């Protein structure tokens, strides 16, 4: 799937269309039976496209239960056009007292993708819950990203209607946690704005193009639920391959590895320069690696053994330099991912992850101080640190930026390291 190329070309065509209209276009609206009316005015006027007809979007709700589902087969796979069937079934078999997790995919995706299965399985493995996957593949199909962005509003309204129906059967909004990836994060936001008192929304690298810096009513925002947590993994400029947003949108916003590019994924700027030498699949894979890390981080975090501790700081550069270590109290620290609502830390939070799975681990600030000298001695080389556990496991970290780093006498060197989880109880250093 050529997702990045589709987004870039669709956005270019949208900008060209807007620039060709020197005068304001007439506002338009459309009403869909049983759903409501949509306009190209107000906070949504900038997109200038109305949502597609519901029959084209073909939204489906796939319902699972940790008690009743078997394998990958949903208990129900219901199109929005037959929503009453959900309520008939739910009245008999839906556990309204159990937490309900709702997964919403983004552009060029569907509920049949592996990541949705892995997230669903992880959620049902840690608690007795219901899981609903919102499949709007027909409205999120390539190549028209702008059309998909417009459709997100309608899908959000459809999702809100599903929840309102389940409320009548006893489901509490305080038991609902929506998890949206990319465009799906904004779908969740639109649904939350409609419902008013939703408990929680987790935005996984919310889509940036057409949403960043827009009116809070036209994107995911902290007002859409009592608790909104966001993981930013690809908040780079679209020209450089960025598909996510860097704008804070929640009560707590996590920026792993700075939030622009992720460890283990190729550098976006270098990639942009070399795009002309690479195949579409190579360019696509490099960019999407950063974007998709958001849902990988979240899925990993569902396991209680996989923690992503984060610290509030003014910038990632300050964080990486150790300026915000240690966390003086629990008010400034948080835990990225599934358990973010269990800790007090809010605001902009930074952390460093591993570059391969497991991505989660504790972070340690290492500082090397050299003894001062009356003589201005300078040497060149690299400094390595090896951690050794009591069962002889070890891992080595290079603390200098390069092999011939300038090492001045009396200077200090600081770096944050993230050891493998098996080395969390190391007993020796070399």
Q: Model-found features: residue ranges?
A:
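Non-catalytic cap/lid and distal C-terminal segments of serine-dependent acyl enzymes
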Residues: 151-152, 197
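Flexible, membrane-associating and regulatory peripheral segments of lipid-active enzymes
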Residues: 1-133, 140-143, 147, 151, ...
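Alpha/beta-hydrolase fold nucleophile elbow
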Residues: 170-182, 201
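The feature captures the conserved acid-bearing segment of alpha/beta-hydrolase catalytic domains
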Residues: 205-262
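Mature extracellular/periplasmic domains of secretome proteins
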Residues: 120, 191-195, 216-224
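Active-site loop->helix "elbow" adjoining a glycine-rich segment at hydrolase catalytic centers
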Residues: 155, 182-183, 206
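Glycine-rich nucleophile elbow surrounding the catalytic serine of serine-hydrolase chemistry
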Residues: 105, 179-190
């Amino acid at each position: 799937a050529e997702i990045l190329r589709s987004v870039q070309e669709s956005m270019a065509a949208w900008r060209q269309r807007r620039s060709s209209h020197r005068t304001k276009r007439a506002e338009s609206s459309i009403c869909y039976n049983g759903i409501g009316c949509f306009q190209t005015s107000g906070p949504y006027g900038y997109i200038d496209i109305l949502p597609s007809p519901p029959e084209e979007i073909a939204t489906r709700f796939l319902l699972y239960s940790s008690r009743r589902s078997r394998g990958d087969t949903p208990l129900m796979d219901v199109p929005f056009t037959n929503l009453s069937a959900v309520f008939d079934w739910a009245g008999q078999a839906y556990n309204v007292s159990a937490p309900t997790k709702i997964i919403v995919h983004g552009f060029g995706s569907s509920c049949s993708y592996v990541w949705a299965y892995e997230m669903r399985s992880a959620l049902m493995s840690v608690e007795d819950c219901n899981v609903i996957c919102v499949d709007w593949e027909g409205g999120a199909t390539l190549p028209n990203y702008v059309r998909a962005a417009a459709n997100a509003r309608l899908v959000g309204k459809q999702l809100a209607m599903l929840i309102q129906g389940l409320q009548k059967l006893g489901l509490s909004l305080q038991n609902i946690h929506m998890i949206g990836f990319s465009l799906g994060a904004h779908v969740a936001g639109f649904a939350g704005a409609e419902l008013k008192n939703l408990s929680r929304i987790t935005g996984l690298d919310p889509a940036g193009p057409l949403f960043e810096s827009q009116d809070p009513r036209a994107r995911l925002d902290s007002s859409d639920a009592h608790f909104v947590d966001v993981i930013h993994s690809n908040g780079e400029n679209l020209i450089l391959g960025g598909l996510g947003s860097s704008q804070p949108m929640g009560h707590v916003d996590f920026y792993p590895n700075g939030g622009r590019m992720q460890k283990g994924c190729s550098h976006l700027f270098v990639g942009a320069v070399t795009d002309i030498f690479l195949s579409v699949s190579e360019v696509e894979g490099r960019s999407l690696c950063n974007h998709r890390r958001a849902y990988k981080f979240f899925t990993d975090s569902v396991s209680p053994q996989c923690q992503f501790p984060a610290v509030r700081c003014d910038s990632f550069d300050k964080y990486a330099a150790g300026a915000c270590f240690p966390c003086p109290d629990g008010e400034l620290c948080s835990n990225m991912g599934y358990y973010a609502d269990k800790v007090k830390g809010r605001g902009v939070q930074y952390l460093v992850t591993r570059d391969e799975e497991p991505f989660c681990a504790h972070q340690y600030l290492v500082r090397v101080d050299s003894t001062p000298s009356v003589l201005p001695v300078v040497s060149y080389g690299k400094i390595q640190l090896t951690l050794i556990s009591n069962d002889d496991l070890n891992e080595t970290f290079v603390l200098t930026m390069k092999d011939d780093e300038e090492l001045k006498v009396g200077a200090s060197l600081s770096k944050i390291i993230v050891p493998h989880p098996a080395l969390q109880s190391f007993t020796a250093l070399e």
